[in-house]
Each structure stands twice: as structure tokens, then as C-alpha cells.
Amino acid sequence: MKINRKWTNKRVQWGHPIGEHETIAGKQAKIASDTFAMDAVWKVASTMADNKHFDIRLEAAIAKLFNTVAHYELLQQTLQIRGGRGFETADSLRARGEEGIAIERLLRDSRVNLMVEGSSEIMHLFIAREALDFHLQHIGALFKPGVSLGGKIVAFLKMMKVYALWYPTLWIPVLSASQFGMDNRLNRHMRTVARISKKMSRTLFHKMAIHQKKMAEKQLLINRFVEIGTELFIMSAACSYADSLKADGPNAANAVELADYYCKEATIRIKKLFSDIGRNNDAATLKLNHRFMQGEFEWLEDEIAKS
């Protein structure tokens, strides 16, 4: 943030500091709010870990997934804002009398975090497995090979007993935002989190009812649910963190503003994810990949310019 703040005030194009141009302004607003969200996530997850009474496997996975992806994207945008200077080494910049900020090196160092200690793809699968665990516990017996008809009937009756109590609660609206006891803006976002959580659970249940045991193979579909769940956790963490900073005087207003902005942007992304769950191009994607793996597009490889 400091690198961008100093540079976008110093660098002038078309008569204005580049930070005043809307294209850069959009990037910097995201950098600021995402940095706050990253800070919130690791602090919330760390606090839960220190408590020793929480099973934080899911929260830790979400924190790893979000923070590594967000950090890499932040550096990508910083590189873009710095322009050609972003590719220079620190020594090269200092030799020209400028501050030695090696953004491209930071970007390369950050990139490895998307692959080690659980790649982003593995994190998606782990989070999905945790999210589906409730359903797998209750419907798994229906699809186990070798289970007798009587066993499946018993499993079905047990499943119906559980879902008859659980499913109706997903349709109960969240009426009051004040119950969260935060700033009004944060309360509204927490109400949104509660409302969308119910919608996500309903939608996931409906998709599982449609795809049944094949649901585990629908990774493109599942990943959208993972992204929604991740966004909801980050929104909750951002609101909680902003609320905890109330005692810090002037930082409190800034914290609420940052959390408010992040949550508004996250809500827009969530709406798009729900839309993609309902209508997507997954079948064509898988078909095209199959043709790719069969070598049907080798002619594109032959058209590459050779030195």
C-alpha cells in the first residue's frame, strides 16, 4: 500500500497524479480493502487457533486460499501501476537515483504460495469436502456398494428425519440486522452473510439432490460454492475485525469504511457466482478439454513463430 500511495501521488500523467485517474483509483480501492480483509482473516483465524477449543481446519484452509490469492493479485496490480519500473531490479532503480523497489521479484516470490503448502486447487477440494461432510454423513449409505435394499430403506428414513428438521430452517428469513450489535453498516453486511448462507445451503442441497453421488466429480460447480463460502467467511472476518477496532479511536471509522467497501464488492461477486451456478458453460468446457487432450488442436502448436 505504501509503495502505491507514494508512487500514484508522485507520478503525473495528463496533468494529474495517476492515482486520481479512475482506472488506477479502482485498483487502489481494491488493494486497500483486500489488504484490510487479509489482515482480518489471519487475525481471526489466529485468535481461533490460540483459543485451543476450535477445530479450525476449514477456517485455516480458507485463510490460506484467500490470502495467497489476494496477495498475489495485489502485487500484480502494483506491478501494473508501476509500469516498466516494476520489472527493474532494486539495483537498477537505485543506479538511476530512484527508490529500489523490486516489485517483479516480490511477485515471483508470492507466486509460489499458490502452489506450496496446499495448492489453491487442493484448498478448493479440501474446503468442499468439509462443506459436504454434513450431507455425506447422512446420504452416503444410500450409495454404498453392497448395501441391501433394507439397509438403504433404513438409511433413507434416517436421512429424511434429519432433513425434515434441517431444511425448513433454511427458509426462515433473517429479519433483524441489529442483532449483531455492530455499526449499522456492518450489521447490514452480517445480515447479508446470514441470508446468503441459507441460500447457499439450499442451493447446494438442491444440486446434491440432482447430481447425487456424481456431485463429487462436479468440481467446476463445487468450486463456485467454495468461492461463495470463502467470500462469506471473509465478509464476517472483516466486519468482526472492524468492530474490534472501535476502541482504537480514529482507526475505527477507516476500518468500518474498508470493511463496508469489501463487503459490497464481495456481495456483487457472490451474485455472479450464484448466476453461474444456475447457468454456465461447464459441459462445453469439459468437452473442449477432452478434445484438447486428444490432440485435436495440435495445428495451433505448429503455427507458433520459430526463432
Predicted regions and their residues:
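Flavin-dependent oxidoreductase catalytic core characteristic
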Residues: 1-307
